[in-house]
Design a protein with these regions (language model features):
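Short, exposed beta-strand-loop hairpins at the edges of beta-sheets
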Residues: 101-106, 206-225
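Extracellular Ig-like/FN3 beta-sandwich strand-entry sites
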Residues: 46-48, 97-99, 164-166, 211-213
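Aromatic-rich carbohydrate-binding modules that target alpha-glucans
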Residues: 12-48, 54-79, 116-163, 174-197
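Short, structured interface segments
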Residues: 97-117
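Tandem-repeat/low-complexity and Cys-motif detector
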Residues: 80, 89-94, 203-207
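Extracellular jelly-roll beta-sandwich "head" domains, especially the C-terminal globular C1q domain
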Residues: 190, 201, 219-230
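Bacterial Sec-dependent N-terminal signal peptides
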Residues: 1-12
């Protein structure tokens, strides 16, 4: 039987689960959004949770246990160790909320968590827009009346020759380039071919495979984007 801390590369985690009193129904699976990123977006109750490699505890279950005692699940990046000890420290949830978002990064052995607040504004800007890379001139998206995390925009995106990165663009939480932004996971991702968003991090940009009128919908909480080429 394996005890103590272990190390496994990220690709060997077939599944990761949240289990414990803080988790609705006792267990919720994390979504694998990339090889090095597992995510949960949803409700957490006051209590504790563990990040486990199986839904139910068994002989092969391992836990991503915080290195610090009483570690709050809301943090900017706390280290964990892999262990088979079911009595190892758990992550603490001290406030109940429907908009928790947790990211587990196996390669960094870190867990980040937050209660996501809706942004006040969201913009489209970049070389593929009519205003280019100018701050103060970005295209404002429209917030959904019923869901403050949902944003839509419809307009022309096309390659503008003669400027830097003529077919690239980004989504910004203000009419300037910092601090808030939503990025694709990889540089030059076709907006029509990937629905994943990443909040903050490296300055990767979206690109176009075709000029035209686009309808774009962003879910800030779930970190997803859907783009349709209207014409």
């Amino acid at each position: 039987m394996l005890l103590g801390s272990l190390t496994l590369p990220a690709q060997e985690y077939k599944e990761l689960w949240l289990v414990g009193t803080a988790v609705p129904g006792g267990a919720q699976q994390l979504q694998k959004v990339s090889d090095g990123d597992y995510k949960y977006a949803g409700t957490l109750q006051v209590g504790e949770l563990r990040v486990a490699t199986t839904r139910k505890a068994g002989k092969l279950t391992q836990y991503l246990a915080p290195m610090l005692p009483d570690a709050n699940v809301v943090n900017r990046g706390l280290a964990w160790k892999l262990t088979a000890d079911a009595s190892s420290p758990a992550w603490q949830v001290v406030v109940a909320d429907d908009h928790y978002r947790l990211h587990v990064y196996p390669s960094q052995q870190q867990l980040c968590g937050e209660i996501v607040q809706p942004w006040g504004e969201l913009f489209v800007g970049g070389g593929a827009t009519a205003s280019g890379w100018k701050e103060g001139k970005m295209q404002l998206m429209k917030r959904d009346i019923d869901n403050p995390y949902l944003w839509t925009w419809e307009g022309e995106l096309k390659r503008h020759e003669g400027i830097e990165e003529p077919a690239s663009f980004k989504f910004q939480g203000q009419d300037r380039w910092y601090p808030k932004a939503l990025h694709p996971y990889a540089q030059d991702t076709d907006i029509l071919k990937d629905t994943r968003l990443r909040t903050g991090g490296p300055d990767t940009k979206w690109t176009l495979s075709a000029d035209g009128i686009y309808r774009i919908t962003i879910d800030q909480f779930n970190e997803t984007v859907k783009a349709v080429l209207v014409k």
